[in-house]
Amino acid sequence: MIGLFRKRKTIRRRMLHLNTMPAAIYAVGDIHGRFDLYERLERQIIQDAASIEGPKLLILLGDIVDRSTGVSGLIDHLLAPDPEGFKRITLCGNHEDMMCRFLGDPVGNRAWLDYGGAETLASYGLHHVAGTTDTVKQHLTTAIPPEHRDFLMGLPLSLTVGGYAFAHAFYDLDKPDTAQHATSLLWGDPARADRAAAGRRLIHGHVIEGNASIRPNRISIDTGAYRTGVLTAVRLRTGEGAPAFFSTKP
């Protein structure tokens, strides 16, 4: 599928690093437009964090767009002030990358519409996109707020802190940020991290599993929210034994 979305230059994105581990980190799996589920899960996280002193970090692991029609409302929410006591960071997933490519060249990257993009555009009131590149771009410019575009274009690829690497799909745990490849971070196979020898751990989404899973080198938290109704988060704390999980599962 990735080969369908190479019709514009690579988008240069940041890779973030924190020198100090916060009091707690909460990471959220692939939301895919399910703003309703994210609101519920964020409330759980805020309630849990109320008893934890010190700064907290809330990381969304990418793929916040596509497949459901709550995308516009979700991005509005993410542009609002962070919850008290939290720093909220959204990483780029392959679906945000596809959307940005479409916005730059809608005719050349029209395949995005078949991978959930149509639902994203519907959330902005666009239910039919056709015409020349200039015509389509005009419709997109009218419908999608510039702050939403800027938000999507500015999403970082990854974040590292302590012994953890957070990325949408894959992060080579044996290599530094400077040796990572954007394509792998967005589209790679997370299972490749199982072979790492560095003693770090990848926290990722991208691949749907029935339940969140813990493996020696990685924690997987994409539980297919758009089709299962289950959105999952993991909490990590220094000195805490096992990670704690939260979800919208009834």
Where are these regions (language model features)?
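Long hydrophobic alpha-helices with heptad-repeat/coiled-coil character
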Residues: 54, 59, 69, 74, ...
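A general structural motif
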Residues: 22, 53-55, 85-87, 162, ...
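Residue-level marker for buried hydrophobic side chains located in beta-strands
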Residues: 25-27, 58-60, 90-91, 165, ...
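Short glycine- and acidic-rich boundary segments immediately preceding or forming the N-terminal edge
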Residues: 1-39
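A short, flexible low-complexity segment enriched in Lys/Arg and Gly/Pro that occurs
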Residues: 4-9, 70, 143-144, 196-198
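A short acidic-Thr-Gly-centered motif at the start of a beta-strand
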Residues: 13-21, 50, 79-82, 157-160, ...
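Core catalytic region of metal-dependent phosphoesterases/phosphodiesterases
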Residues: 28, 33-113
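Acidic, His/Gly-enriched loop-helix segments that form or flank divalent-metal centers
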Residues: 104, 110, 114-220, 224-230, ...
